[in-house]
């Protein structure tokens, strides 16, 4: 793997990279010296921030009906941005919304900035949405310019999805088994976006690694492929000089993601599919206190959340930002002009009793559907009439109170895509989920069950060549051809042919060809012919021809010139006399 010489230092100016294509791959030692870690953020917290930002982009884009290529492009922008900037300087949710906004325009599936902000408002609580400040749209627009300068306007990104489908077409075997392998590998690609694998390896290598991991978990050994005689291992026809150790390292990083995030799955499941037992009628006040830390930190460490998370999220509204390594002066000036103590108090008063209760009262819908229209009246009912004790969940839908005027609307408008998503690029995607993840509750349990299964679930693939073991059709539908009869051996001698005797009164039959009879002599012309002709086949001139006359000077006479066509010769006149 090439070492990133030009991007390893965050202080590299853009003037030195005007005429060179940036390299977006780093070694692990470079990933241990990111700007966030240089400012005192521990690696575990940075990994959690990257995971939460990637899931936020994935969930917002899924609710807006964006294509998976757009979601992956936005997440790649997010990871590259924080290789030059710190999480302490730029909040992750604002950066995630900005990356999704830019990726929609690059992938030709644009969404309005206000729609992205409204969807983010429905997914985040008040503390998390406070990162957007008083003017969220202006925050995203200002950050977009910084994002473009950071990624050096290199907007085109390749993803492992297309390589995964391309490589799957080269495999041989049962189509159902290969489709199951592709579905599992596709899910691993979705989850790998929450890691830094896209900053370490090319998409071709990641596609091979997830196929390798899916084959191991499915107990499906790839034994036949198109270029098997040329390559010893199946992935060498796609990527060369990649040892097994590299694939094993990528697989371990993906599996470590599930072991690290299993305690934090409630943080991501509200964005996807929440389990019904956690949404049973419970007292609202204690549930609100537990829902806020579940979005940002682990439940087992509530003491670490208080000194870090609120201070970091309220930092943009309380004190000016530190200068960042990249040009961030417009963002710093904007913060100093817009924020004021009065607006802080106004923005902090009404929201707290509303948004967290919405998340604990109503089950989130699947990502492909927007929230129902009855969500804003319920949010208003919970916000205005806050009960001091337990509230029965069956009475909540009957409350009809008009929603108050709120600067940040709670509900999300139905998605209005500018164009339908492109058709699936391969037949393996028929009936396949493109937004699946093993980071949810059910997905993690199914992954654990597959990892604990012992013994191959599929038998060995049949050989691709050789005679079939059974008839391809039923015998009385297409009977097989009978074997040909044996050819008799030739006789040792042939008897003479029987010639019938000649019949009297009829002319004798024409003579037949006899190989022992000599051929007749050639017929010559008669000798009385004048002049006598030479024998056929001889081209020599006869002896009676006189020799050509040669003048004394040794030069044969020159024949007269041939008259031009259409001009008859005139006797007795030369050419000069005739022209007179």
UniProtKB/Swiss-Prot annotation:
It comes from the Eukaryota. Residues 263-277, 285-321, 377-386, 427-444 have a biased composition (Low complexity). GO terms for biological process: cell division; DNA damage response; negative regulation by host of viral genome replication; positive regulation of DNA-templated transcription, elongation; positive regulation of transcription by RNA polymerase II; positive regulation of transcription elongation by RNA polymerase II; regulation of cyclin-dependent protein serine/threonine kinase activity; regulation of signal transduction. This is Cyclin-K. Gene3D superfamilies: Cyclin-like. Residues 262-580 are annotated as: Disordered. The lineage of its organism: Eukaryota, Metazoa, Chordata, Craniata, Vertebrata. GO terms for cellular component: cyclin K-CDK12 complex; cyclin K-CDK13 complex; cyclin/CDK positive transcription elongation factor complex; nucleoplasm; nucleus. It is linked to Intellectual developmental disorder with hypertelorism and distinctive facies: An autosomal dominant neurodevelopmental disorder characterized by developmental delay and intellectual disability, language defects, and distinctive facial dysmorphism including high hairline, hypertelorism, thin eyebrows, dysmorphic ears, broad nasal bridge and tip, and narrow jaw. The gene is CCNK. SMART domains: CYCLIN, Cyclin_C. Widely expressed. Highest levels in testis. Residues 400-426, 477-568 have a biased composition (Pro residues). Its main location: nucleus. Coiled coil: none annotated. It holds the Pfam family Cyclin_N. Changing residue 111 to E: In IDDHDF; contrary to the wild-type protein, does not rescue morpholino knockdown phenotype in zebrafish. Regulatory subunit of cyclin-dependent kinases that mediates activation of target kinases. Plays a role in transcriptional regulation via its role in regulating the phosphorylation of the C-terminal domain (CTD) of the large subunit of RNA polymerase II (POLR2A). Regulatory subunit of cyclin-dependent kinases. Identified in a complex with a kinase and the RNA polymerase II holoenzyme. Interacts with POLR2A. Interacts with CDK12 and CDK13. Interacts with CDK9 according to PubMed:10574912; does not interact with CDK9 according to PubMed:22012619. The modification Phosphoserine is found at residues 324, 328-329, 340. Belongs to the cyclin family. Cyclin C subfamily.
């Amino acid at each position: 793997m090439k070492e990133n010489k030009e991007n390893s230092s965050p202080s590299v100016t853009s003037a030195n990279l005007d005429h060179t294509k940036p390299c977006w791959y780093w070694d692990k030692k470079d990933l241990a010296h990111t700007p966030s870690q240089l400012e005192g953020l521990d690696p575990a917290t940075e990994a959690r921030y990257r995971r939460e930002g990637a899931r936020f982009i994935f969930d917002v884009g899924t609710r807006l009906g964006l294509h998976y290529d757009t979601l992956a492009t936005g997440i790649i922008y997010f990871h590259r941005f924080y290789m030059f900037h710190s999480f302490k300087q730029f909040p992750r949710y604002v950066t995630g919304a900005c990356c999704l906004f830019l990726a929609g325009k690059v992938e030709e599936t644009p969404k309005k900035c206000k729609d992205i902000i409204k969807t983010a408002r429905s997914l985040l609580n008040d503390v998390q949405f406070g990162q957007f400040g008083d003017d969220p749209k202006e925050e995203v627009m200002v950050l977009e310019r910084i994002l473009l300068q950071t990624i050096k306007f290199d907007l085109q990104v390749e993803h492992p999805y297309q390589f995964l489908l391309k490589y799957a077409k080269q495999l041989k075997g049962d189509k159902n088994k290969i489709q199951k392998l592709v579905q599992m590998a596709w899910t691993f690609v979705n989850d790998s976006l929450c890691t830094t694998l896209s900053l370490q390896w090319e998409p071709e290598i990641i596609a091979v690694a997830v196929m390798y991991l899916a084959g191991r978990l499915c107990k499906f050994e790839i034994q036949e492929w198109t270029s098997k005689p040329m390559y010893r291992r199946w992935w060498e026809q796609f990527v060369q000089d990649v040892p097994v150790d590299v694939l094993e390292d990528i697989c371990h990083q993906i599996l470590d993601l599930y072991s690290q995030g299993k305690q934090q799955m409630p943080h991501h499941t509200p964005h996807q599919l929440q389990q019904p037992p956690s949404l049973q009628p419970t007292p609202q006040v204690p549930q609100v206190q537990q829902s806020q830390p579940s979005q940002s930190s682990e439940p087992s460490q509530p003491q670490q959340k208080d000194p870090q998370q609120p201070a970091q999220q309220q930092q943009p509204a309380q004190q000016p930002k530190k200068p960042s390594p990249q040009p961030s002066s417009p963002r710093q000036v904007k913060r100093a002009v817009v924020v004021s103590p009065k607006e802080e108090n106004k923005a902090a008063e009404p929201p707290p009793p509303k948004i967290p209760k919405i998340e604990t009262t109503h089950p989130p819908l699947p990502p492909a559907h927007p929230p129902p229209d009855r969500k804003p009246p319920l949010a208003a009912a919970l916000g205005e009439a806050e009960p001091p004790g337990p509230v029965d969940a069956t009475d909540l839908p009957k409350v009809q109170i008009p929603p108050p005027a709120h600067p940040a609307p709670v509900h999300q408008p139905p998605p209005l895509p500018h164009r339908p998503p492109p058709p699936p690029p391969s037949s393996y995607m028929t009936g396949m989920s493109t937004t699946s993840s093993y980071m949810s509750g059910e997905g993690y349990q199914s992954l654990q069950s597959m990892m604990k299964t012992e013994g191959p679930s599929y038998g060995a693939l049949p050989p691709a060549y050789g005679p079939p073991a059974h008839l391809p059709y039923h015998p009385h539908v297409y009977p097989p051809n009978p074997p040909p009869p044996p050819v008799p051996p030739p006789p040792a001698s042939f008897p003479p042919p029987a010639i019938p005797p000649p019949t009297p009164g009829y002319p004798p039959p024409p003579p037949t060809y006899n190989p022992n009879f000599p051929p007749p002599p050639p017929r010559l012309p008669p000798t009385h012919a004048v002049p006598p002709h030479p024998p056929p086949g001889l081209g020599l001139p006869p002896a009676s021809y006189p020799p050509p006359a040669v003048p004394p000077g040794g030069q044969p006479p020159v024949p007269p010139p041939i008259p031009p066509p259409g001009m008859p010769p005139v006797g007795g006149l030369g050419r000069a006399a005739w022209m007179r």
